[in-house]
Amino acid sequence: MKVSRHTKILEIINLKDIETQEELAEELRRSGMEVTQATVSRDIKELKLIKVLSSKGRYKYATISPTESFLSNKLVTIFAQTVLNVDRVNNMVVVKTISGSANAAAEAIDSLNLDGIAGSIAGDNTIFILSRSEETAFNIVQKLKKMINE
């Protein structure tokens, strides 16, 4: 079911300019698939869909290009090789890297499109990530630690 839904989503966004999850859910329903907004939201994450500016000047869902996917994988590798420690203080995540690597590691974090990140800033060897809640910060730390096998 999920595979056929994912296939249909990719077909829909390639044929039409879909701007919202609600529009996508409606298109799926028109094709005979019963979906909720939560399901569509998960599908968008799993398919790693992004929003791009359409020729009409509005944002629409699109697939990530192979080049961007390749770059994202490279950044994750760089992250795993340069991060020394990931810690949390309240709703702030602190990532320590080897000297000169914080910007590349921060770019890797950005490429993950993690939910709940309000913003981040990178220095030479430290990244501060402001999350929207302590629970979100905890989840971010867990995900980042998995990436460095900690």
Curated annotation (Swiss-Prot):
Does the entry feature the keyword Transcription regulation, yes or no?
yes
**Quick check: keyword Acetylation in the entry?**
no
Supply the SUPFAM superfamilies for this chain.
C-terminal domain of arginine repressor, Winged helix' DNA-binding domain
Entry-linked Gene3D superfamilies: 3.30.1360.40, Winged helix-like DNA-binding domain superfamily/Winged helix DNA-binding domain
Q: Which organism is it from?
A: Clostridium acetobutylicum (strain ATCC 824 / DSM 792 / JCM 1419 / IAM 19013 / LMG 5710 / NBRC 13948 / NRRL B-527 / VKM B-1787 / 2291 / W)
Q: Which UniProt keywords apply?
A: Amino-acid biosynthesis, Arginine biosynthesis, Cytoplasm, DNA-binding, Repressor, Transcription, Transcription regulation
UniProt name for this protein: Arginine repressor
According to the UniProt record, one GO cellular component term is: cytoplasm
The gene for this chain is argR
